[in-house]
Amino acid sequence: MAKLPIISKLFPSCRWKVTALIVCGVLVGSGGLFMYLLRAHTYLGDDPAACVNCHIMAPYYATWMHSSHSRDATCNDCHVPHENMVKKWMFKGMDGMKHVGAFLTKSEPQAIQAEEASAQVIMNNCIRCHTQLTNDFVDVGRIDYMMTLIGDGKACWDCHRDVPHGGMNSL
């Protein structure tokens, strides 16, 4: 019994299947090797050493390493939101893509400044970790970063300028 022409067109030949399988294997393997060489897997955890995969972060890592925060806080403890996992991973992914874009286009600034969204996250995390201190002593816990932008208070780093990264001149 001869094959029906419609069946021949719907199901590719064995040679085509093998070729497609090899090409897909090479693409997936190359992509996996590329991601491994970029150390992409290090960004899935909270290890601060991942932040120095990019050379521009080395001075910030070094100053954090010599600060009191290095004993108790990772980069993600301060720089990533902790309200829920979705918000954390979305922020981490978007921020990471901005960093990759700046790195690939060589447009990263000499001295990194937190953008408004990052500053909001950082201040929220200062308040989250230092809740008793901020509520009992300085009333900072009752304001947020957006209020500081309109003059209704100060951001934590307005007074604590060298926390946790210290003076860059001290390196």
What are the residue ranges of the model-derived segments?
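Short sequence/structural segments immediately N-terminal
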Residues: 2-171
